[in-house]
Amino acid sequence: MAETIQIGPIVLRFLHSRHDTNGSLDMFEMDVAEDGRMPVPHYHRNWDETIYGLRGTLMFDVGGKPITLNPEDTFFIPRGTVHGFENRSGKLATCLCVLTPGVLGAEYFRELSAVVAAGKPDPKVLREIMLRHGLVPVAA
């Protein structure tokens, strides 16, 4: 059964994780509400990410290059590449995210969700959570 995790305006539905793929991949659908965005651009130390558009439109910045993700579009983010996204379309947007190898799991997102749900999160706490899970935040 898929696990659903909400982090503010972003909802993740985990379809597979490192736990059920023997570490091969993590896979989740990500809904981004209108005006939703990744609060901190970052890069991954230990995994690559492939994004596939399902519905709506998201704007990504990948390595300083703007990318518009529409339904059926796809792109690849190599580990070490700074990226971020936002939904400027005025409508819900959804994409499929595949992380390879599967080293993150849902644990990071669960922890982040709890901190965000408790109120305005301390940026130092968010940074510590990100670093502990292999994401390196980069100043915007």
Question: What is each stretch, according to the model?
Answer:
Residues 64-82:
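Short acidic-glycine-tyrosine-enriched beta hairpin
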Residues 86-89:
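Asparagine-centered strand-capping/turn motif at beta-strand->loop junctions
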Residues 5-41, 48:
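A short glycine-rich, His/Asp/Glu-containing loop-to-beta-strand
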Residues 42-44, 83, 133:
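Histidine-centered active-site/metal-ligand motif
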Residues 91-140:
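Double-stranded beta-helix
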Residues 29-33, 43-61, 98-99:
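Short, conserved beta-strand element in jelly-roll/cupin
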Residues 11, 50, 57-59, 66, ...:
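Structural motif
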Residues 39-41, 62-67:
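Short beta-strand segments
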